[in-house]
Structure formats: structure tokens, C-alpha cells
Amino acid sequence: MAEILLTSVINKSVEIAGNLLIQEGKRLYWLKEDIDWLQREMRHIRSYVDNAKAKEAGGDSRVKNLLKDIQELAGDVEDLLDDFLPKIQRSNKFNYCLKTSSFADEFAMEIEKIKRRVVDIDRIRKTYNIIDTDNNNDDCVLLDRRRLFLHADETEIIGLDDDFNMLQAKLLNQDLHYGVVSIVGMPGLGKTTLAKKLYRLIRDQFECSGLVYVSQQPRAGEILLDIAKQIGLTEQKIKENLEDNLRSLLKIKRYVILLDDIWDVEIWDDLKLVLPECDSKVGSRMIITSRNSNVGRYIGGESSLHALQPLESEKSFELFTKKIFNFDDNNSWANASPDLVNIGRNIAGRCGGIPLAIVVTAGMLRARERTEHAWNRVLESMGHKVQDGCAKVLALSYNDLPIASRPCFLYFSLYPEDHEIRAFDLINMWIAEKFIVVNSGNRREAEDLAEDVLNDLVSRNLIQLAKRTYNGRISSCRIHDLLHSLCVDLAKESNFFHTAHDVFGDPGNVARLRRITFYSDNVMIEFFGSNPKLEKLRVLFCFTKDPSIFSHMACFDFKLLHTLVVVMSQSFQAYVTIPSKFGNMTCLRYLKLEGNICGKLPNSIVKLTRLETIDIDRRSLIQLPSGVWESKHLRHLCYRDYGQACNSCFSISSFYPNIYSLHPNNLQTLMWIPDKFFEPRLLHRLINLRKLGILGVSNSTVKILSTCRPVPKALKVLKLRFFSDPSEQINLSSYPKIVKLHLNVDRTIALNSEAFPPNIIKLTLVCFMVDSCLLAVLKTLPKLRKLKMVICKYNEEKMALSGEANGYSFPQLEVLHIHSPNGLSEVTCTDDVSMPKLKKLLLTGFHCGISLSERLKKLSK
């Protein structure tokens, strides 16, 4: 959509203006003025677009056409900036005088064209009376329907019985913290239906009650007035002083209030000034529903949260059946053919466990013949039909996102349905596309700001959490099928993303492509074989089994490509030839190679000076030339497996570019680097390094790391692979920020308490000799939550996890993972004091014959 392109333009103009100021100084003040004008004008246009979208949704074709013009303008401006920035950098590198260069004159001419187009858009807006918009009538109708539903006698719940019983007990518990229950979850899960049934069941146990729909654009005065009328405040008291009289009454009454669909915390800040706290001696209760977990957390605390989940398949079919037959128990599947029943099950399954989708679909089917042919037609068109019925409810959550977060959400459209996506990938692709920028004066890194956006998407229940890291951060996530459909539709509508199927046979659409994903090798080969013009392409995702993928790509100059992701899914190792034309992708910022890929990046990579992330999967064997260090913006170099790190790119020969060519403030991840290329001055130089892996650690490296002052200070993750027994004592006690430590050694190594960082949360030991001395040290680590021991040798057959006389043993440990132990036959913990927080014991790999004490047996199931 237009606002997404405008956001990208604004962010890129900020970057270019900063580069001009730093690199060229007063010499280019006139050029910086043009960039600043672009930035200001795009901000104003974006504000107008955000308001105008409501009128577009209402069906105003004039606004729709105007927004299309604005979108095309924003796209052309982005193309201009992407083409212009590399020329600034090249000109600066070779000390050309920009003012006299031809491209600077060309840029000035393009700016004048843009100014004329802006004036023309404003003329059209005024000429055809396309004025600023009022509230969208459709939204008002939707809000009114929700208010009616809130008071309707609809209390049938399917698949939520356990949730209902749990919440009922919680509400009637006298010790309920804050007196608040927060029902949260993604749109369509039945939060309001469940809350209504709870409210109606318990309200007779209170002196007064009220239920209010809050909405996305609430007015505190109207909400308080609604509550006052329902709890019995007299008209006179309302007219005298609504707030004071309402608060006074609620202080002495035992009440229950349901606040449905709260979108943000600001409205609660207004309401709580009047509504007294529920945890008073009176014993009042508050039920809230929200799409945003952070809202519930803010109002009632963490303990108030109750997150609804999609229905299981049988419960989905049960609800589907009830809605098909209008809850008439006398009419069921008894007279239906087995084929029709199976089609019905498939239709219910396509709804993804979302009650709203099931209800909408059943409503469509009730208006059709109950035949296999009619239902099959619905099944075949499920994606569109269900989406149409749920679109407004789901789209409200999207429209509520901050403008800057919307392209981040749409990025999920590039992935297949139900695909687990690493947070690291999303964060760095967002940064590569300039969706995330650090404003001047903000000391936080772009990665931190991007992580905030991801956390917000999860809190709003638009994205589902898949895995967390050792320290509670999001490790991976996925998007629900129904929301994925919405995401894809929105992305295609705005020309944000397409598949090859969408644009085949239409050269005009192909030429406008900005992001494309291939899931099929045949489609990919046919598409590239059609010789498409891909001059505007920014992002290319290829999920493929074809080793010749790079040969297909060699026919094109992806001069504006920012992001390239190649996922090779075949089971065998495939050698790929990456041609030298790979170096023509001079705008490339993010490169990810995943799967069984074997090959070498060409020396022309030296031209990819804007690369920020290189991510090589553990299954890939990719050699990097030394030219990679010419990418002075490089932030993350990730070899997921240390076996790949024996790589020529790490040479520090003075004849080739090397790691010292990098800007010292940029590099954050270096995983792995061979120790023979590791020097003391390197660590002192890389001041923002957060993740470091060293292969073949030497005594000199141990000595460097064990100094009293941490180098670097920002280090959070450290992985060390030893090939020999170090004579130097490891001392990492001066690294307070390290929370994850991985040690791999083939020989015996003595470690005392000073070997470990004071705040370590996750520790992995590989091929260690584990004895009682080492175990005694591990037991005392105060913040250790996860301990993983892989292929370790045990010089004692029995590993006793209990503490000494004082019982002090693994005070924070939650997960103990033992993989393929050697020489271990028994693991015991004979008291209830040791490991008080242990939740799980994992025995994996070859571990036959290991006996466990009773407590550990329960935790290993």
C-alpha cells in the first residue's frame, strides 16, 4: 500500500541525507536540500494517505484512484533513491566532484519531475473534491454490530469448556490478584462469546454489573455513562457529577464489569481514574477481552492473562455441525452420505480452528444445497470465501498497527503457510529493506528496534510464538493460516509481494514486481525462461530443489535487489555454480543460503559493498572470498556450523581485503572465525560484537579473553571450540553480559567458578570430561536455566545432582539435557530442595541403561 512505500522512502531519504552530511559536507548542501524536501513531503503525504484509506474502504472510487497515483509516485521515488545512493558512495570513494557529475544533474531533474507530480496530485484532490475523510461508515456499522452481539443472547461455546471452567474458578477465587481476568488472543477465537457466558453466569453473585464494548476508537465519557446506567446510578447523580458519583457507588458495591475489545492502554488510563481497584475487600471483578496481550498485562498483570488457542480438529467439526444444523439436535449427519461428511470435515479443517471462520463458512453452506457438488465448490474456493467473511474483523488488527510496522507484518506473506520463521531472519531482512531505521539521538541498535516490532506483533496476536530462546526472547514464530491469507491478499493488493502465478503473461505487472517468492521449480524455470524485466525487484525468495538456480538468475541484472534467500530442499548435497554476475547485485544487503548447497561465491562479491548480513546454513558448504570484507556495512557473518569456518576469506594477508577493512562499529555477529586468524587487536576493535565463535582456540586467545576487562563489552554469546587442552586457565567472570556459553573440547579441561560469566543462562558442554569437581562448580551457577551436555565422558557412573548439606544445587535450572553420554549409568536427585525450578530432563541420542531417581523419572516423560 502507498503508506508502506512512503515509509520506505522516508527512511531511505534520512539515510542518504545523513551520508551526504557526513561524507560531502557543505559542498552538497543544495543536494541535501532536495533530499530533505523529499523526506518532508513524503511525511505529509503519508499522513493524508493514512486518513484517506478509511474513505477508500467505504467504496469511494475517487480516493482509490488518487491513492493509486500516490502509490506509483512513492514507488518511483524509492527507485530513484535506490539508484542514487550507490552513485553517492562510488563518487565519494573516488573523490569525484559530485556537483559537476552528470548523475547529480540528472537527479536534480528527477526531483523537479516529482515536485510537478506532487502538485498535480494536489490539483486532482481539490478539483474533484477529494477532501479529508470522516470516520468510515462501514466501521461504524461493524462497531454497532459488535455492540448488539455483546447484548444478544448467544452463549453457545464449543471447544472452550476447559477455558470456561478455568476462568470461572479464577473469577470466584477470593485471592484473585487485582480482581482482573484478561482473555486475550487473535481475532475470531471467541473471546467475546466466552467472556459473555462467564459474565452472565456470575453476575447474579454481585450487587451490580455492566458489560460495555470499548472499540478501537473509544470515548471514556461514553463508556462510563454506559456503565453508570447499567449499575443503577440515577439520572440525577449522572447529571450532577458522573465520574465522582460513579466512583463513590462502585466503592461500596460488589460489582462485575465486562470491558470487551480493548485495543490500547490509553483508554484504561482514563477509566481507572473512575473505576476503583477490584482487589479491595469488597471483592469486585473485572473481565476484559483484547487482541493485544500487552493490554491485558498492563491492566491486570501477568497472572490475569488467559490466552485462547485455535480449536482442535474434532472441536472444529463439532462447532461446524452445530452451525450447519442451527443447533437442532434432531437434524444431524445421519441422512448425509459419507462423502458429504468427509467434505464437511475438510471444510471445517480449512478454517484453521478459528470459530469465526467456521461460523462464517457454515453460514455460507446453509444457503446452498446440501450436496457433494455444491459443498465441493465451496471447498475449492475456501481461501477467498472465508477471507471475505472474516476480512473486516482481521483487517481491523492490521489497520491498528503503526504505519512503520505494517510492512513488517506483510513480510510474512513471502513465506509458505505454517512455515516456522527465525526471528533473526525477519529482523535483519526488515533492516535490509530500511523498514527499521535508527533516528539520530537514539542509542539503540536497529536490531533492538526490530525486535520491539516483532514482540508487538506477537503481543497483538497477529503472529504466533513458536520458540523462545534460553533468555526468554523470541527465537522463531509463525503466522496462522487465516491471517496468512489476509497477509497475502493485502501484500498483493499493494504490489508489496507476488508469486509468479500472479503475474505470468502480463509484462506490465512483471515490470512492477518488487518482491517475489518461488515454491515450484517448474514455475521458476518457466518464469526466468520468459526473460522478464525485473528492474524494480527488491526481494527474491526461492524454495527450490534445482541446483542450477544461480544459472537462471545470471541472465538478469538485479541492480536493486536488497534481499536474496535460497532454500535448497533436496536431501543430497548439490554443487552449485555461482557466476561472477552475482557481483552485479550492488544493492544486496541480505544474503541467506540454506540447505544442502555446496559451492563458492565469486570474487565479484567485492562489489557488494552494502552487504549487511551473510547467513550460511549448517548444511551448506559455501566458500567466501576475501572480497567479502569490502562490505564495510557488514553486521552479521554467520556460519551455522564451525566445520565451515576453515575458509579462505579469513586470511589477513596484506595483499587482500581482510576483516580489518570493516567499520569497527558495525559487526555484531562473527560465527565462526579460525583462531589462526584471530588477533588481540581484533577484539578491541569490534566494540559492538554481540555473538562470537572461535574455532581451534589457542592459549593466547584464552589469555586475551581472560583479561580483567571484557573485550568486547557488548558480547552476549560466546562459543569456543578447542582442538587441544589449553594450559591457560579460562576466566570469563568479567563478562556480565554473556548469557550463552558453548564450550567444545576433546580433552580434559579444569574449570573453576571464575571460568563462567556471572549471569550465564544457557551453558552447552560438548565432549567434556565430567567429574564431581566440575559438577560442584556447575551447581553453584546462580542464574543457569538450561544445561546441555553433549557426548560428554563421565569418570563416575553415577551423577548426583543433589546439593551438599545446605541443599544449594542449581537454584534456577529449568532444563537439563544429556545427549549420548559415555560412561554414565545413573542420574539421581534424592531431595526436593535441589533444583527447585527444574521442569524438564531430556535424554537424547544413545542413552540406553541409564537409571533415574523417582523425581527425575517424572520430569523425563
UniProtKB/Swiss-Prot annotation:
Other comments on record: The Tm-2, Tm-2(2) and Tm-2nv alleles present in the tomato mosaic virus (ToMV/TMV)-resistant tomato cv. Craigella isolates GCR236 (AC Q71BH0), cv. Craigella GCR267 (AC Q71BG9) and cv. Yukang 2 (AC Q5MLE9), respectively confers resistance to ToMV but not the tm-2 allele present in the ToMV-susceptible tomato cv. Craigella isolate GCR26 (AC Q71BH1).
Name listed for the protein in its UniProt record: ToMV susceptible protein tm-2
Annotated GO biological process: defense response to other organism
Binding positions for ATP per the UniProt entry: 185-192
Function in brief: Potential inhibitor of viral mouvements which may confer resistance to some tobamoviruses but not to the tomato mosaic virus (ToMV) and tobacco mosaic virus (TMV).
Membrane topology (UniProt): Peripheral membrane protein
Keyword Cell membrane: yes
Keyword Membrane: yes
Lineage of the organism: Eukaryota, Viridiplantae, Streptophyta, Embryophyta, Tracheophyta
All residue ranges annotated as the NB-ARC domain in the record: 162-388
Subunit record text: (Microbial infection) Fails to interact with the tobamovirus mouvement protein of tobacco mosaic virus (TMV).
Compartments, as annotated in UniProt: Cell membrane
SUPFAM superfamilies given in the database record: L domain-like, P-loop containing nucleoside triphosphate hydrolases
Gene from which this protein is expressed: tm-2
Family note: Belongs to the disease resistance NB-LRR family.
One example GO MF annotation: ATP hydrolysis activity
SMART domains named in the record: AAA
GO CC entries: plasma membrane
Coiled-coil annotated residue ranges, if any: 63-83
Pfam family, one: Rx_N
LRR repeats: 225-248, 305-327, 388-411, 449-472, 510-536, 585-608, 609-631, 652-680, 689-713, 735-758, 781-804, 810-835
Keywords for this protein: ATP-binding, Cell membrane, Coiled coil, Leucine-rich repeat, Membrane, Nucleotide-binding, Plant defense, Repeat
